[in-house]
Amino acid sequence: MTDTTVDIAFSPCPNDTFIFHAMLHGLVEKDGLDFRHHMDDIEVLNKKAVLKTFPVTKLSFFAYLKLRKYYEILDAGSALGFGCGPLLICKNPGINLKTAKVSIPGELTTANLLLKLWNPKIKNCVITRFDNILSGVESGEFDAGLIIHESRFVYKDFGLKKIVDLGLWWEQETEIGRAHV
């Protein structure tokens, strides 16, 4: 590594690995820079951002709102879209969300912010690595789970049911989606 080495941190989700693949494997011009990559779960990255561990890092938008004094959003590499927001899922519909044990991908995640805005009475939350939430709900370890990334496309394969699509709820609640239709 050289004195032009930049530490860059992102999650192992497919969006991130796709976004950074060409840069990390020398498939695009890097203008003399070298990159040292660090991959970790989004909640770990959010917490490391609070500590300002990496100069370039993936952040949840919720975490960014708290850290915007120290970080700026790049022109490319951000993943925020319509029809792909977090889902709250369960095995047994009709659970009491006020007392349910809910697995969440992190305290500073945008998914958790949306969950708290949608239902502030949900209090019994357990932070779980995003790729372990589906199996935790399926096994009964958790009553419900807040899923992100590609989990939203496969939760039915685990025999789980959708309680709410928080991305859709947010779009309808704020009418943001109407501006992009």
Q: For the regions a protein language model found, what residue spans apply to each?
A:
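Ser/Thr-glycine-rich phosphate-binding loops at phosphate-binding pockets of nucleotides
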Residues: 109, 179-180
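Bilobed "Venus flytrap"/periplasmic-binding protein-like clamshell domains
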Residues: 5-25, 39, 84-143, 150
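Short, structured secondary-structure boundary patches
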Residues: 76-82, 165-169
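N-terminal hydrophobic or amphipathic helices and topogenic motifs
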Residues: 1-79, 86, 90, 95, ...
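Active-site regions of enzymes building and remodeling cell-envelope glycoconjugates
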Residues: 71-75, 123-124, 159-163
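Short loop/helix-cap segments at secondary-structure boundaries that form the rim of catalytic
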Residues: 66-68, 115, 154-157
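Pocket-lining segment of extracytoplasmic ligand-binding domains
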Residues: 130-178
